[in-house]
Amino acid sequence: EGHYAAVMKAMDLLKEYGIVFGTSICYTRDNVEAVTDEKFLRFIADKGARFGFYFHYMPVGQNAAPELMPTLEQREEIIKKIRWVRTGDNDIGFFPMDFQNDGEFVGGCIAGGRNYFHINANGDAEPCVFIHYSGANIRTHSLLEILKQPLFMAYRDRQPFNENHLRPCPMLENPEILQQMVKETGAKSTDLQSPEDVTHLCGKCEEYARKWKPCAERLWAEEKHKKHSYENYKKK
């Protein structure tokens, strides 16, 4: 009974009919070990999933719990684990991707219309599924007008938000940048459940960003970067 049983049934049906599908998993301080455990990965691979996206918990909303953000050690470990699973050193048969830690392969943040944007249930065009601010709505604006809205243009003007792509996000790792963009462009909160001032949102990320910075710099320096990947930035 419940959601778990429904998901298991859906996966079984997809596998039975040969439909390629993947998973979407949010990792937190409390579950990161469980959802990256080799036994769990083999389980979802056996259920038929061939790829999956891992999403770092984002403290979005008035009732968010910043204490659920992974520890520095957990984040460093998931980087290693995800990349190990993608190597030929195992037979798991599942290809995981990490939305927060794979920035190197897509040139950092892809939001704000650089490669994608999000439309919520009200039609508000937001730069990212985690960033609920906007100045345009699909009901009243064309796609071109949405892409040209001030907040999206501010994104494009500033991307990449960090040359270290282990610090790609203007909220989580560079919270001062999102605050500046939202305030300068006059974008309004579009969170339908829990409208939130950008200062309050980013305030929950400041300590995390400060502590993650030296870890990210060390890991970035240790990486063997063969070339810069996919840098479709606005020309400056």
Q: Residue spans of the language-model regions?
A:
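Radical SAM/AdoMet-radical enzyme domain recognition
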Residues: 1-55
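Flexible mid-to-C-terminal extensions adjoining Fe-S/redox cofactors in radical SAM and related proteins
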Residues: 130-236
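A C-terminal junction/extension of Radical SAM enzymes
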Residues: 20, 57-127, 168-177
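Short, conserved loop/turn and helix-capping segments at secondary-structure boundaries
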Residues: 1, 69-76, 136-141
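Short, hydrophobic secondary-structure boundary micro-motifs
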Residues: 23-24, 95, 155-156
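Conserved short-loop catalytic and cofactor-binding motifs
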Residues: 28, 66, 131
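Generic alpha-helical structural signal
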Residues: 8, 38, 76-83, 144
